[in-house]
UniProtKB/Swiss-Prot annotation:
NCBIfam families: Hfq, PRK00395.1. Residues 8-68 form the Sm domain. One of its GO terms (cellular component) is cytosol. The lineage of its organism: Bacteria, Bacillati, Bacillota, Bacilli, Bacillales. RNA chaperone that binds small regulatory RNA (sRNAs) and mRNAs to facilitate mRNA translational regulation in response to envelope stress, environmental stress and changes in metabolite concentrations. Also binds with high specificity to tRNAs. HAMAP family: Hfq. Keywords: RNA-binding, Stress response. This is RNA-binding protein Hfq. The keyword Methyltransferase does not apply.
Amino acid sequence: MKPINIQDQFLNQIRKDNTFVTVFLLNGFQLRGQVKGFDNFTVLLETEGKQQLIYKHAISTFAPQKNVNLELE
């Protein structure tokens, strides 16, 4: 049985759905936008046509504007 990677499923679903998300950083700063891509270490966030590459180790929380449907089975 293949292990479930919730992080990748979550990020991929909000990317595919173009869901707006608030990203809370460890320093308390908040970024709002859409996830355009991600890898093991970074997340590419687009806000008002501008891109920001955020390192995952700096992220505390993702708060999407709507619920994300995941296939956890």
